Amino acid sequence: MGWTAVSGAGLSWADAPETNAVSTQLTIPYVPTRQDVVRDLFWLADVGTNDVLYDLGSGDGGIVIAAVRDCGARKAVGIEIDPQRIRESREKAKEAGVTDRVEFIQGDLFTNDFSQASVVVLYLGQRANLDLRAKLVRTLRPGARIVTHQFGMGEWPPDKELTVRTPYLGMFGREANQFAGNPNVPDYEAGRNLATTSTLSMWIVPAPLAGIWRGDVSMPGGKRELKLALHQRLTGLYGSFQLRGATNVEGWVSADLWGNHLRFEGRLTDRPYFEFGIMFDGHIRENTMRGKLAVLERSQIREDQWESRRDKADFTGTWEWNGPVGARPVHLKIEKRDGTWLGDYLDRGWNSRAANGLETTVRDFYDFGGGFYFTFLIGRERNKGGLGYGILVDENAGWLTGEAIAESNGVKGTVSFYPYSERPKKDIVVQQGSQPWSPRRVTP
């Protein structure tokens, strides 16, 4: 099934086969974003003179034109599939006198390049956002901002959020009636979106942080190696540290990532805070981490510049682990195709619907340097062994998610399953069914 957006200064998308996607999408109602909401979107993303803004599904071009006219953006680009909207956008840009700094591209936002964007605006719908987010994270530079109107990014919580309420006569008849009950907008919650409330959200594209990092630390007895094992679920981070020496010191790490700006703290699990701790504030550039490291030991703090390097990682190949029912093995094949990391989920033992079992491409896959993260939607079927993964996507459908880092010629992380209905919620912290995950590589 293919997804393509039509109107980003408004909203439209369709779950339609790509062969007839254009004709289907052109029948979806176009609703422009209110000007007060546009201003708040720009404020939330802090759009300024150095920014290049892309509106994916740009409609009549209102957001694109306003970005350069009102915020002084260096450039703004709209991608829109409807040729009539493209013509309207170009006429409006000419009237506004901004044709030298705007561009309107007729095409599919899933295939067009937007890698130069520092700000991306979306008004597409929950499912379209989920289909698009892997490309956003893969394509945009760390620190780029993604802003959305009304719809979220699943289990990826926003970095900032704003609720806008504005008196607007006629809102009930014009907007709500067109979206409510529209099969092309199944995630539109009519009760929540009535009246004049808009929810605006922003995400900062994270740098690829996952992996094993090593660097020397100057201590009273000489230099000691500090090893970090950092796991990454988009902007969700966790890990551990080991300070090696005559006696190794080990503990857990909590971290916060803002683009390529990283802060982390390390604590011991069995000793008081004032006895030992580490704190870091710095930046990531490819496979190098640089910044200021503070070491707290027996109430004494030492600060110094610190640099660490990430271990090389190779997680290509087919990985095997026991499925959710009994000891039946399932597989995840990870490979790079046309420059993009993808996975194939294989369950040869599941055969109630297909002779070859379940096989599906995992497109929501993220290469985070020394580790990876993935999610995909699967069904559930009941059998004598309990609940197993199946191909039916029904009321029992859910998301299989996994993350791991390359370590000791293998990978180590967690794998989780949780119901489909829970993914849009923003308060999910611990996913249901999460368990340690150390799959075996069965083919290189």
Which residues fall in each region the model found?
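Glycine-rich SAM-binding Motif I of class I
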Residues: G61-I65
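S-adenosyl-L-methionine
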Residues: L11-D51, I86-Q116
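Conserved SAM-binding motif I beta-strand of class I
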Residues: K75-E80
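Central antiparallel beta-sheet cores of small beta-barrel/beta-sandwich binding domains
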Residues: A207-S408, K412-R423, D427-T443
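C-terminal substrate-binding/active-site "lid" region of AdoMet-derived donor-dependent transferases
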Residues: N129-P208
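Conserved class I S-adenosyl-L-methionine
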Residues: N50-G59
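A short SAM/SAH-binding and catalytic strip from SAM-dependent methyltransferases
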Residues: S115-D131
